[in-house]
């Protein structure tokens, strides 16, 4: 103990000796406890500079800083090897401890002891280093089948411990309860999309990450229809479907499969629809057409008859000869009525 005290500057030998004797009585890792000292709490964000305030009574008094049982400064002598630590020298009375780029390892109690004429005056500061939220583990993007149970995981660090929340951001933007794990039982196609995990603790902006969930489901045909079909002109049938993965479409006329370019037929397949076009409609093209949609989860189909246009339009039925006869009869009756009215007029 005497050898250690002799290693300090002469002006600070007494202070170093007192501190060393005090610290040597403590078990390793235990902090110095001054029951008469006032305790102040300081919150500092990780990466910022912490200034722990302490003032001497006059320019001649001596001070010291301790962190737990370790001496940081004794008077003007620096005992710590940490280059981030220094004493503020704004004026002769200022003996504040400055720690640059604070980290979580700097968290804990600090004690400033000032030697007065009678007894040491001490002040304690408990430094709490706050850490912004950081998501360090989140579920990978996934592709699963409809009806499967799914658990999404989002783990984050921070001080205070961040609150974690989930949100289905597409397509419904539905919020969920807070928690590291989001359980979805029997997932449906409507629950596909992006899920956003947000970690927040008010130290900084929330940390946000996303998981994309693709839900496979068997295809469905939502609509099949055609426009007016006239011989000698083009006609088309449109088949609207849905499925994940996108379904492959096929066309049949009766039991016979149709191919693109066959007998004036053009087939255009897209992710959610297929269009069958007949470039020059003839009598052979009329009949029953079936659209088939298939992916690895299933197959479905829908049919539509392609019929020739009705020869009786605008509500008129019957043959052309019948129509001519009706017009002849109408003209004859009209002539008879006209002659009758003319005769009566002459007689009068």
From Swiss-Prot:
SMART domains: IG, IGc2. Glycosylated. A lipid is attached at residue 318 (GPI-anchor amidated glycine). One of its GO terms (cellular component) is postsynaptic density. InterPro entries: Ig-like_dom, Ig-like_dom_sf, Ig-like_fold, Ig_I-set, Ig_sub, Ig_sub2, IgLON_domain. Coiled coil: none annotated. It is a lipid-anchor; GPI-anchor. Disulfide bonds join 54-112, 154-197, 239-291. Residues 1-31 form the signal peptide. It comes from the Eukaryota. This is Neuronal growth regulator 1. It comes from Rattus norvegicus (Rat). The gene is Negr1.
